[in-house]
Amino acid sequence: EVKREDLQTVHSFKIRGAYNAMRSLSPAERERGVVTASAGNHAQGVARSAALLGMSAIIVMPTVTPQIKVDAVRALGGEVRLHGDNFDAAKAEATRLAEAEGLSYIAPFDDPRVIAGQGTIGLELIQQDAHLDRVFVPVGGGGLAAGVAVLIKQLMPGIKVIGVEHEESACLKAALLGGEPITLHHVGLFAEGVAVRRIGEETFRMCRALLDDVVTVSSDETSAAVRDIFDDVRAISEPSGALALAGLKRYVAEHHLSGERLAFILSGANLNFHQLRYISERSEIGEQREAILGVTIPEEQGSFLRFASVLGARSVTEFNYRLSAARTETDPARIFVGVRIARRQERAEIVADLEEAGYDVIDLTDDELAKVHVRSMIGGRATPGVPERLFSFLFPESPGALAHFLQVLGTRWNITLFHYRTDGADYGRILCAFAAGPDDVELTEHMDRLGYSYNEETTDPAFRFFLAR
């Protein structure tokens, strides 16, 4: 069973909690209006609810919010105010406005009225199928999971409720391990609708008491679930909207479930169209339909043909190679190859076949750097004798954002590698290497001062295999 919240007027479940919270306000509070901070589905839910209830609504959004989202909120009747470079700054401004102007602040998840509104999905699920065994619910701030769990456990306690988190924003898992809500240092933004650094206090209390289990999934698994939904019902889900299905599939595989009646919540469909390219590319890996390999072969005539013969009838999905001017005649060639597979175990079989034929092979299927950047950069390697450090960056997309990044980066260190990629989401990705040694403390300090989310990738196997000297 699938509960389709993408069919809401704002294409997301968020209108339920916002409407319930705003409907419960007193006449005087309604007269004064409401305020919230959001750059996502909650913003549209509040704006639409205000229009339905005849209230004014101020939506504070970060200045880096894509114009398409600003326009969507304004089209629903919300008054948008842009403030700050991130959500925390926008929330602080919304809180200030609430106090200064006597407005009611509508929280995105950690509010009993919002939780109750989201919980109505649980009632409709039971009405849709009273014989369910398990329900899978996406978890961001926890409002949806808490609301659905409390209602189902009250009416049908035998139904198990499973929370599903993205592995790069698993704030509930962190809180369960720590015994209390914990602020994550970094969250991935692929599944933006659940990209929450810290679960709510009330939602954590309820989720800990009522959820039967929690499972985490990857971007690849989520992308595969987006495609599954399209194949089954011809709906295009946003990544966070497909999260519950990704969790359902993982849970079934890990626990060898069969014969049970399962349901998941398709929580939203506010997808940036250009993100589909990235999702389509990653869904093959998420479905275990593609293996990504780095293979060393002799740099000699006929070596490609011999390599292909080892693969046999298997379908090659990608083959990247470039002769480097710095390579000597005795240096081997390194190729980046994608191979279509029918099942997960076939990855190991392909690697074994290649190794038996005398090739050195690295399985890069689960290597994020390889899938996002390196596959587009196969070519020359670093200059011999020049030390190099590699960093990946995440920065908000907006007009001129790349130029601003380069200005902030400065010219103190020589850039030896650069790759920029946008997947249509609100954040862009950059891979950048500098001519610097591991003991260059000044470079590390400079990275910390930039103000961008970053990771050092110097030891990444895909980088070492294809691009490092």
Language-model region placement:
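PLP-dependent amino-acid enzyme catalytic core
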Residues: 1-401, 408-469
